[in-house]
């Protein structure tokens, strides 16, 4: 089965446990069951490599499972609150014995996951843009070693200290151009 397809055939659970209520909600397996806050914590992840820890796209992919669990929980708690309010308004419910999960808490968790995903995606976008700019303005590859291992004989690579020196020269060159343009603009403008 393709992971992008969702199973549309799901069992139905009754809302708020009331057997005489005709309103039913789809429940995809154990995700929709009430869980205590301790059970909602993600299981400990096995030790990942250093590359996986720094990869923002991997972090977004790992948050997708939490997001898929959070959406139904948020919608279920909202539906239960609406159903409970409807029963209270129509006086069909004797008492408020069934505790309703906190909608605000579920909604906050959902938005928290969305914010984390947005942060990781923006960071990944920024990293890609910086890599493209670096490749455009400095088409040489940089050796990741921080120590200068002497002059490089290859014309297509730079050591890290050479890279830092090149970047420093580019920054000072851009600053000199900026200062020259500011001075020229001041010379052109009439004195007040």
Swiss-Prot record:
Family statement drawn from the similarity comment of this UniProt entry: Belongs to the Mediator complex subunit 29 family.
Higher taxonomy: Eukaryota, Metazoa, Ecdysozoa, Arthropoda, Hexapoda
GO molecular function: transcription coregulator activity
BP terms from Gene Ontology: regulation of transcription by RNA polymerase II
Protein name: Mediator of RNA polymerase II transcription subunit 29
Region described as Disordered: 32-51
Pfam families referenced in this protein's UniProt entry, alphabetically: Med29
Subunit structure: Component of the Mediator complex.
Origin: domain of life: Eukaryota
Native organism: Bombyx mori (Silk moth)
InterPro entries per the UniProt record, alphabetical: Mediator_Med29_met
């Amino acid at each position: 089965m393709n992971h992008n397809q969702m199973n549309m055939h799901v069992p139905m659970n009754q809302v708020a446990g009331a057997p005489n209520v005709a309103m039913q909600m789809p429940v995809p397996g154990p995700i929709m069951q009430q869980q205590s806050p301790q059970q909602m914590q993600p299981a400990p992840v096995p030790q990942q490599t250093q590359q996986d820890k720094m990869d923002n796209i991997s972090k977004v992919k790992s948050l997708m499972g939490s997001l898929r669990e959070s959406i139904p929980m948020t919608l279920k708690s909202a539906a239960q609150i609406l159903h409970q309010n409807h029963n209270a308004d129509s006086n069909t419910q004797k008492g408020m014995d069934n505790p309703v999960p906190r909608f605000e808490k579920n909604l906050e968790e959902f938005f928290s996951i969305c914010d984390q995903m947005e942060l990781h995606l923006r960071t990944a976008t920024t990293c890609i843009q910086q890599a493209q700019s670096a490749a455009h303005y400095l088409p040489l590859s940089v050796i990741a070693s921080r120590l200068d291992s002497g002059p490089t004989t290859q014309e297509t690579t730079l050591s890290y200290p050479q890279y830092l020196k090149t970047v420093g020269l580019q920054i000072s060159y851009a600053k000199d151009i900026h200062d020259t343009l500011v001075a020229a603009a001041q010379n052109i403008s009439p004195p007040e």
